Amino acid sequence: MDLSSLRPAKGAVKGRKRVGRGPGSGNGTTAGKGNKGQQSRSGYTRPVTEGGQMPMYRRLPKFGFTPPNKKSVACVNLAQIQMWIEKGLVGEEISVLDLKHLCNASNQDYFKILGNGEFESAVTITAHFFSKSAVEKIEKAGGKTVTAYRTLEEASKVNGLPFEEALLTPKAPVLKKKKKSDKS
């Protein structure tokens, strides 16, 4: 006996039922589906179909709104930054690009530094937002905080400025147009 001669026990494997192959087979014509009606047709009904009754998704009102220009914020704790410093993943200056790569946050727009955990490194951290406790801990350790004003995408589209400089320059304020009726 070898592997090529192994077979299942007799009667263990049931034969496939071939339907719709002529009246002599016993499962021809209607193929075991009965006569007419919804169950004999191909395809399926949607699970929300409720017969003639008004379906639930039409009975309930629409609600909510998704803003098209919504910006997402990635939060980073000081304990995490301290761990990166101890591992040698970042140097004396931590930029927004460093945060993006180390947080694995390719789809985040802004970065916020939170003051959770111990922090004893004198480093310069660039981010969009800082919590009060984070600023206190960074300055107590002898470090500095630098606020970035633009997202990485916005900074890459600024003409005439290097990327790092464009990140740190504030956006120009939007001026309101004067109405024609206001004559002064």
From Swiss-Prot:
GO molecular function, a single term: rRNA binding
Superkingdom of the organism of origin: Bacteria
Keyword Ribonucleoprotein: yes
GO terms under cellular component: cytosolic large ribosomal subunit
GO biological process, one term: translation
Biased composition (Gly residues): 21-35
Keywords attached to this entry: Ribonucleoprotein, Ribosomal protein, RNA-binding, rRNA-binding
Family annotation (Gene3D superfamilies): 3.100.10.10
Entry-linked InterPro entries: Ribosomal_uL15, Ribosomal_uL15/eL18, Ribosomal_uL15/eL18_sf, Ribosomal_uL15_bac-type
Region Disordered, annotated ranges: 1-62
Family: Belongs to the universal ribosomal protein uL15 family.
Function: Binds to the 23S rRNA.
Assembly behavior: Part of the 50S ribosomal subunit.
Protein name as annotated: Large ribosomal subunit protein uL15
Lineage: Bacteria, Pseudomonadati, Chlorobiota, Chlorobiia, Chlorobiales
